[in-house]
Amino acid sequence: MSHTHHTVKHTHVRPAMTPAQSGIHVAIIMDGNGRWANARGRPRTAGHIAGARVVRKIVEAAPDCGIGMLTLYAFSADNWARPSREVALLMRLFRRYLVAETDRCVTNNVRMRIIGRRDRIPSELLRSIKVAEEATRHGTRLDLRIAVDYSSRDALVRAAERLNAQQSVTRDDLSHAMCKVDHWDGECRDVDLLIRTGGEQRLSDFLLWECAYAELYFTDRRWPDFTSADLGAAVKEFHSRERRFGTVPEAAAG
């Protein structure tokens, strides 16, 4: 009586990438709120209120545009120098956004994370941040990162301080250290497309390390007027560009 032995091969199947992992990383400098309000004879605070409403629309539109990670520049470290009344309003608006949008993010499978310093943020806002991050931590459709009290130069300095004791430092070491100081525990990803609204053409100390090879897209449209169609147009132009990452075009190389 013969026995046939079958060898079972075990193959390792890599888990499929989530939409958040496979989509492009878009960063937006949301500029022009104050000028939008001034053009209408209204206080600057009215522009910030109008701009906050746009954030929801852009976040909802992002996954359908093929965006997996969206980083929004909400409040820079330099913005503390603005009038105290304006700063206080921005902090209230941000907390109101977190309270109002956390459940929506859970429903829409969006993970929300706040990057930047946390030692100068009001305690009530800090509590809301922790609640929002914990509630949305399982989101896989979109990684939404909101930069508050953020400075890229400051992040670089603090990351270097963390690595000071190491004998040698690689690019990956620095990237991971910057993620740590910015309270981001996800994948350290470069920016694919940087959008700036409001007509200015500068980076304003935003994601300087991550934007090393980013495509830049500037629009005169002020943030309160920015629409999901504008976002789609920016992404469409991004996909039409040839990204070389320091190399030469294929035609020239051949």
Model-derived segments and spans:
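Flexible, compositionally biased loop and terminal segments
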Residues: 1-254
